[in-house]
Amino acid sequence: NHKSNVKAQMTEWNMQLEAGGEHFQELVNFVREVSMECSPVQFIPDCYDCWGAVYKKGNHTVSHDHWPAIWSWTYYVNVTSECAPLVFTNTDYKVQPYNGLLVMFPGWVKHKVPPQESDHERVMVAGNLNCRSGLF
């Protein structure tokens, strides 16, 4: 395993490049399209990392950001309404996950996941986007 703010079972950082990663690459391509539609300026995004995590009861993520990423994202694969939310630190804003939800936010925004209280696993994929070098 590797050093991470995520205190849950994780894949490698570049799972979209691993064997069988073509399904994750499809998700990354979708995220890239959404980021281009939602960004206030035109840019061509590159996903420089992508990972999966499975949270079991008691697992959590400590508060952190993804600077210098332009966009960070998380996609919920298998969750229930009892699963832990995504919490944006120092705000009252939290997102309760549901299957198929994509959440995108600026990479500098601090966020965390409180301890998972449900017995149901919280399965998600996340990643970071930056501008493809020299292309705006």
Regions found by a protein language model. Give the residues of each.
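Non-heme Fe(II)/2-oxoglutarate
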Residues: 1-42
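Catalytic core of non-heme Fe(II) oxygenases with the double-stranded beta-helix
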Residues: 43-115, 120-124, 128-136
